Amino acid sequence: MSDSADPGRSVSGGIADLRPLTRMKNQKAWYWYDWANSAYVTTIATVLFAPYIINIAERAAVDDRISLLGISVAPGSLPSYLVTFSTILSAFLLPPLGALADRTKNKKGLLAFFAWTGAAFAALIFFATGDNWQIGAIGLIGGNICLGASAVVNDAILPLISEEHDRDRVSSRGWAWGYLGGGILLAINLAVVTVLPFGLSTESAARVSMLSAAVWWAAFTFIPYLKLSDFPPVHVVPESGGIIRQSFGQLADTLKDLRNYPVALTFLVAYLFFNDGIQTVIASSSTYGSEQLGFSDDVLIITILLVQFVAFFGALTFGRLAKVYGAKRVILAGLVVWMAIVTAALFLPEEKMIPFLALGVAIGIVLGGTQALARSYFSLLIPRGKEAEYFSFYHAMDRGTSWFGTLTFGLVYQFTGSYRPAIFALIAFFALGGLLLLRVDTAKGIRDAGNDVPAVI
């Protein structure tokens, strides 16, 4: 082989390792996908879709009921049903997708396919007008499923573009970019919905804002699609048949092989508990703020934006702390803060804006950091060549059990009639997650997976 054919050699024949430069180029491109998809998460899934689709469904309701797949439901319950349906469907679809992604060289193409398909579904919501809530429902379900599929591929790329010792930094920076991008577009869209420029009605402003999130998601996905490298499959289990049959064969082999990675499984269970607690706090915070503490929509909007932008700095800070103390210790510290947050929420005074905003700052600090480090920490515990498969389990199990926290919140409220004990009850998820995480032997898990043990774990 000639020197010029080897990317690790200079033209003069001397050895020049170009891999760090390639990794840096890929990392910069990879960050943009978190920036891209967070617009959908914040503007559509978190803030605007639910009140918009409820309003549309109320027009179509007969005796305050609509028919969803033959089931009579109240319009106010429609967003919850749609999210639940898409979540359960994702839990079944993601594992075979992971096996397919591991066998695919063009992972950036697969990432872009799911992103652009998801953005197309999201754009359908723009056409949900009058009493046609069904097209909005299809848009959200398709968008959510494609978002989960793209997250599997995106997370699986993380171990391919970063070495073990640098993974926490890279993952945290990606999360930070996501919060910044999602926060910027959300601020613009909330201004549009509030100010109503160009004579827009509130409904039209919401439609335009959600369409902008779909366009944002699709447009910024071009950056990773064009600039990420290809990653040829490694350690692929030989299987007969076409790519789909091979993927299912590999998935079956991986399911049998899971028992060989007990440390990764223990962490997964820990993650399911504490992440469910995090997601439930986020999902219920608006309800808690409005129904229990008596805050107006304006205060809730300010708090949502505050959390978004504080989370940008929180994710970066957690990445730096992990470099010094190790991801596991920093995640555990974050869970202690989460327990303090739900405890403080129990005693938060009504209609006192400053304490509520202070709680939002605390949430922002630990929100992005704990999730970003969970992603990078898990990547150390999984074998090379099966990154997408294991991240598909990571996301599928998350979706399959994500109703535990909301069920707990709902049941405690039903029995007590107050949201204060309901929010405090979530402390159990952080405590159980932390106790299980304490049992994770990081060094052993990394060695079992065949990865290099970083100097700081």
Please provide the spans of the model-predicted regions:
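Glycine-rich segments within core transmembrane alpha-helices of 12-TM secondary carriers
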Residues: 171-193, 395-405
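A membrane-interface helix-boundary motif in multi-pass transporters
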Residues: 69-75, 192-215, 411-430
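Juxtamembrane intracellular "pre-TM" segments in multi-pass secondary transporters
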Residues: 9-28, 229-268, 456-457
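C-terminal ends and interior cores of transmembrane alpha-helices
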Residues: 112-131, 336-350
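Short amphipathic helix-loop junctions that connect adjacent transmembrane helices
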Residues: 43-76, 283-300
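C-terminal transmembrane helical hairpin of 12-TM major facilitator-type secondary transporters
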Residues: 328-371
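Helix-to-loop junctions at the C-terminal end of transmembrane segments
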Residues: 92-106, 313-327, 413
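Hydrophobic core of transmembrane alpha-helices in multi-pass small-molecule transporters
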Residues: 121, 132-150, 354-369
